[in-house]
Amino acid sequence: MNIVILAAGTGKRMRSALPKVLHPVAGRPLLSHVIATARTLQPSRLVVVVGHGAEQVRAAVAAPDIQFAVQAEQLGTGHAVRQALPLLDPAQPTLVLYGDVPLTRASTLQRLVDAARDGRYGILTVTLDDPTGYGRIVRDASGFVTRIVEQKDATPDELKIAEINTGIIVTPTAQLAMWLGALKNENAQGEYYLTDVVELAIEAGFEIVTAQPDEEWETLGVNSKAQLAELERIHQRNVADALLADGVTLADPARIDVRGTLRCGRDVSIDVNCVFEGDVTLADNVTIGANCVIRNASVGAGTRIDAFTHIDGAELGAHTVIGPYARLRPGAQLADEAHVGNFVEVKNAVIGHGSKANHLTYIGDADIGARVNIGAGTITCNYDGANKFRTVIEDDVFVGSDTQLVAPVHVGRGVTIAAGTTVWKDVADGVLALNEKTQTAKSGYVRPVKKKS
């Protein structure tokens, strides 16, 4: 089967320099959703017709299995499909999809393809409570499709028809090429409409078959930012419903955003306003507090992530405790039972089993062993303005508050570092490391007093 995806439109009502089909739903371009669905049907040829912003669109979705046809001048949907004809296998049927209709299920498209087997012409239709503005499907007394009539051309009786044309079709390719060549642009827009092919197929004696989606929203397209927002909420509600069906506890299904793939184990609980991006895995009994952002991360069983935590490109072991207001950046790896508390940032660092950094700390480019306590205000000084260096802290080290570790530096097992120490040399196992300081007390000192105006 050939699949053609129309993605050449200008999208004027989007009021954006970005091509319409590249606007995101759930963190991915509209067109990427359509391509992903198309691939599940295993087409022999997959062609995307580009036009407005063609180079941007190509760059965004280019892949070995995708061919591109160019519609240099925007002359309608029929003209767009015509540009794809040289890339199609004429012996296979062609399914036509739209790059701004992202939520159509693969099962719906398969139903249409199955209905149109043996050389039939298939149309995806949908029945709407309010069909105003759409082309109506007109059937004869036997139920056969006789034509599609546009709103402006419909009779009063035809306007009562609730079944409308979605524009998604499947048809024999050789005949499609012939019909496209016969299209005329005698309309107000001066364009060649793909919908006009239906009448040509009927005149040629082709049987017109239809299929309908399970849900009305599967055929919704995007022409404005308001419609884009509407589809985003529909998609996110679908994701939330699937999570609930899998046993995930959501404090409010209307306040979760999944912009990628979220895999959850048993008894996972997610509070409100959480955003998941990229590829995220939450193991059994994970609890996520409110207002967290988690991107491309794996979270071990029994972990608790408190409110306002940001995690990006990190791996968390089992029973870790993170936040609130913590930040784990790419390369952060936490072993089982590690703690990273409020206003702690970890980047490209390993924190060992049971180690804790509970307050106001920066850990970057570091290897920290097991059972290490990192006091408040500790900083690994990893950057000299040109190069990054690593800090190594062995097992069972106690780091006092307000410590600076100037990398590259190695701290041995069981070391105690006194509060306020700057460590710039390696420290041997088991010692107390401190900077000698003298505390002086002066009598007779008087603090300045503000003068009253």
From Swiss-Prot:
Essential cofactor(s): Mg(2+)
Listed GO biological process terms: cell morphogenesis; cell wall organization; lipid A biosynthetic process; peptidoglycan biosynthetic process; regulation of cell shape; UDP-N-acetylglucosamine biosynthetic process
Residues bound to acetyl-CoA: 376, 382-383, 401, 419
Start and end residues of each stretch annotated as Linker: 226-246
Residues that hold Mg(2+) according to the record: 100, 223
Alphabetized UniProt keyword annotations: Acyltransferase, Cell shape, Cell wall biogenesis/degradation, Cytoplasm, Magnesium, Metal-binding, Multifunctional enzyme, Nucleotidyltransferase, Peptidoglycan synthesis, Repeat, Transferase
A GO CC term assigned to this protein in UniProt: cytoplasm
Coiled-coil region(s): none
Region: Pyrophosphorylase, residue numbers: 1-225
Reactions that this protein is recorded to catalyse: alpha-D-glucosamine 1-phosphate + acetyl-CoA = N-acetyl-alpha-D-glucosamine 1-phosphate + CoA + H(+); N-acetyl-alpha-D-glucosamine 1-phosphate + UTP + H(+) = UDP-N-acetyl-alpha-D-glucosamine + diphosphate
Similarity-based family: In the N-terminal section; belongs to the N-acetylglucosamine-1-phosphate uridyltransferase family.
Protein function: Catalyzes the last two sequential reactions in the de novo biosynthetic pathway for UDP-N-acetylglucosamine (UDP-GlcNAc). The C-terminal domain catalyzes the transfer of acetyl group from acetyl coenzyme A to glucosamine-1-phosphate (GlcN-1-P) to produce N-acetylglucosamine-1-phosphate (GlcNAc-1-P), which is converted into UDP-GlcNAc by the transfer of uridine 5-monophosphate (from uridine 5-triphosphate), a reaction catalyzed by the N-terminal domain.
Protein name, as recorded: Bifunctional protein GlmU
Classification lineage: Bacteria, Pseudomonadati, Pseudomonadota, Betaproteobacteria, Burkholderiales
